[in-house]
Amino acid sequence: TFDASNQLATSLYNPVAHGRPDWSARAISGNSLSDPRLTNKIQLRSLAVGDTMGFMSDQLLVTVGARHQTLKITDYAYNTGTRSSSYDQSRTSPMAGVVYRLRDDLSLYANYIEGLAQGETAPAQNNGQPVTNAGQSLSPYVSRQKEIGVKYDAGGTIYAATLFSTDKPRGLIDGSNTFVASGKDRHQGLELTVQGEPMRSLRAVGGITLLDAQQRSTGSALTDGKRVLGVPKRQLSLALDWDTPWVEGLSLDARVVNTGSFKTNSANTLEAPGWTRLDIGTRYLLDVQGKLVTLRARI
C-alpha cells in the first residue's frame, strides 16, 4: 500500500523518526505480491529493412534503411484495475550510416537513426502530494540519435572516438500537479574506447564517456539549461575477460564502472555523489550431446 497524502517533517537528507501514521483516504494498494494486478501492458512490433552499398572498391560504404514500429501501451488503475489510458501509434523511421576508409587501419564513420519510443510514466507523488495522473504513460515519442567518429586498428588493438547527440521529450509536473511533456532533454557527449588482447587469453575493453546533458525549452528559468537529473558528467569503465589455463572452457571476467556526481532534482539544487561498482563472474563452456552450452555466474 502507498499513501502520498500523509506528510511528515523529515527528509532523506535530515531524517527524523516518526510513529506509523494512519492510512489516508487517498491511499492506493498494489494488491498481494503473490497475485499482483496488471498496471501496465506494452506491446512493440518492429520490422526493419536495410542495404549496404560499396563504392570506390568498397573504400566508401553507405547503409540506408527504414524501420516500421507499432507501439501499444495500456495503463490500468491500481485499485480498480480499470483502463486509465492507452496509446496505439505506428511510424516508419529512417536510418542511415556511412563508413569511409582512409587507410586499411583507419576509418571515419557517421550514422543517424530515428525510432518510436515509450513515453515516461507519471510518478505517484510530487512534494508529498499525489500526482493527478499517477501511473499514466505519456504519449510515445520519436527518438533521434546522431553520431560521428573515427576508428583506428593498431594491429589488434582498436581505438575509437565518437561524438554523439540525442534528444527526447522531457516530462515534468505542472502547476496543477499533473505530469506532462514539456521541453526536451538533450544529451551530447564524447566517448573514447579501446579494446584488444594485451596478453594471450586476456581480453580488455575500456572507455570514458563525457556527457553534457541539458534541459531545453522547459518554460522555466529555474530549470532551462540545467543538467538532466540522474546523468553524471563522466563515466569510466573497464572490462576484462580471461580464459583460464588450468580448465578448458572456463573463463573469469571482471568489470569496473565509475561515475561522477549527478543532480537529483530538475532545479539542480541537490546533488548525489559519484559511485564505483565492481562486477565479477565466470563462464564455463561444455558439450552436451553435441551442443555447446554456456553456464554463467555473476556477482
Regions found by a protein language model. Give the residues of each.
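Conserved C-terminal beta-signal and adjacent last beta-strands/turns
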Residues: 110, 146, 229-299
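Membrane-embedded beta-strand positions of outer-membrane beta-barrel proteins
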Residues: 1, 51, 62-64, 96, ...
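Surface-exposed extracellular loop regions of Gram-negative outer-membrane beta-barrel proteins
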Residues: 2-9, 15, 72, 95, ...
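Residues that define the transmembrane beta-barrel architecture of outer-membrane proteins
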Residues: 41-45, 88-92, 142-146, 153-155, ...
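Short loop/turn motifs that connect adjacent beta-strands in outer-membrane beta-barrel proteins
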Residues: 1, 55-60, 103-105, 155-156, ...
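Gram-negative outer-membrane beta-barrel transporters
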Residues: 57, 158, 163-167, 181-266
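Residue-level signature of outer-membrane beta-barrel architecture
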Residues: 52-55, 98-101, 140, 150-152, ...
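Signature of Gram-negative outer-membrane beta-barrel scaffolds
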Residues: 2-106, 116-119, 133, 207
